[in-house]
């Protein structure tokens, strides 16, 4: 088993006071066993590797809370389009051409990019979690998978299988309940997901209030915003999370606070698709995570 010493580092632990101090970090196998100042007694052990971090800042890895990792192959493929046209006219047709094994390879490309940016784990949603799981385990990268149940791919049975399988496998991977979005998922499937959430007593995650069009069409279908509709069917009874959260009113924000629905903002994506900007001051004022 490896035993690594990182020394002569400026260390930022991300505690509330944000103190930076000179010290070292020991990694015993896959666990951080020591963070602190130089301790001669601890350094008597034989390390398998010692790394001089002089001139560098050592801090916890970043977490990317919303990714579609295998979509690396679509970067710059379609620009200057609104979300629906971008998805339906360009992205979905290209994804339909993916062959067996492609997602594993493309996920590895994404993981390499994450690591060069200091990202050590991600929360990923895509069409084949098993291929990405294989890639993450092979590369020693931590991934939490989010289900993407919708009218076109996946099923409630598959969601149940992924929940049972990926949460009992390698410790680097795990799975959370999720649907792609309200606008891609029938009421029947959404209600089925709410039942799963109640069965497992688990939160549910999805793309939420990303565009003005999404909110307007949901109001036409159900007479409510996406947040209000999903809450009405019990989807958020055990909490959850919404990716984007751009087009939310005060009622939506109050529901998210009360039901412990976190909002993951995606400013670069929203800028690319001109979807809008999440109202961070309002979210913070409402007490939303």
Across the structure, where does each feature detected by a protein language model lie?
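Active-site-adjacent C-terminal substructures of enzyme catalytic domains
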Residues: 235-289
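A structural motif
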Residues: 119, 141, 201, 260-261, ...
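Alpha-helical scaffold segments that flank or form the walls of functional sites
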Residues: 75-140, 160-169
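Metal-coordinating catalytic core of metallo-dependent amide/deamination hydrolases
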Residues: 131-246
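Divalent metal-coordination and catalytic microenvironments
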Residues: 9, 25, 30, 55, ...
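N-terminal metal-binding scaffold of metallo-dependent hydrolase/deaminase domains
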Residues: 1-44
């Amino acid at each position: 088993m490896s035993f690594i010493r990182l020394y002569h580092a400026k260390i930022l632990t991300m505690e509330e006071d944000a103190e930076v101090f000179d010290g070292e970090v020991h990694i015993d196998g896959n666990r951080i066993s020591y963070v602190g100042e130089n301790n001669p007694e601890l350094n008597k052990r034989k390390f398998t590797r010692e790394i001089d971090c002089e001139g560098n800042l050592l801090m916890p890895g970043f977490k990317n809370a919303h990714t579609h990792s295998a979509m690396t192959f679509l970067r710059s493929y379609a620009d200057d389009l609104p979300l629906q046209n971008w998805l339906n006219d360009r992205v979905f047709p290209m994804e339909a051409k993916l062959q067996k094994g492609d997602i594993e390879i493309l996920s590895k490309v994404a993981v390499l990019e994450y690591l060069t940016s200091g990202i050590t784990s991600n929360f990923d949603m895509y069409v084949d979690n098993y291929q990405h799981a294989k890639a993450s385990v092979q590369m020693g990268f931590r991934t939490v998978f989010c289900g993407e149940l919708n009218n076109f791919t996946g099923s409630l049975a598959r969601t149940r299988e992924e929940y049972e399988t990926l949460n009992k496998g390698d410790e680097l991977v795990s799975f959370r309940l999720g649907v792609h979005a309200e606008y891609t998922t029938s009421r029947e499937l959404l209600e089925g997901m709410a039942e799963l959430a109640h069965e497992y007593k688990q939160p549910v995650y999805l793309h939420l209030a990303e565009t003005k069009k999404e909110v307007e069409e949901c109001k036409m279908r159900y007479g409510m915003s996406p947040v209000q509709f999903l809450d009405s069917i019990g989807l958020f009874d055990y909490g959850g999370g919404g990716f984007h959260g751009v087009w939310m009113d005060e009622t939506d924000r109050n529901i998210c606070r009360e039901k412990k629905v976190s909002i993951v903002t995606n400013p670069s994506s929203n800028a690319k698709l001109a979807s809008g900007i999440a109202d961070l001051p309002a979210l913070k004022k409402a007490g939303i995570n």
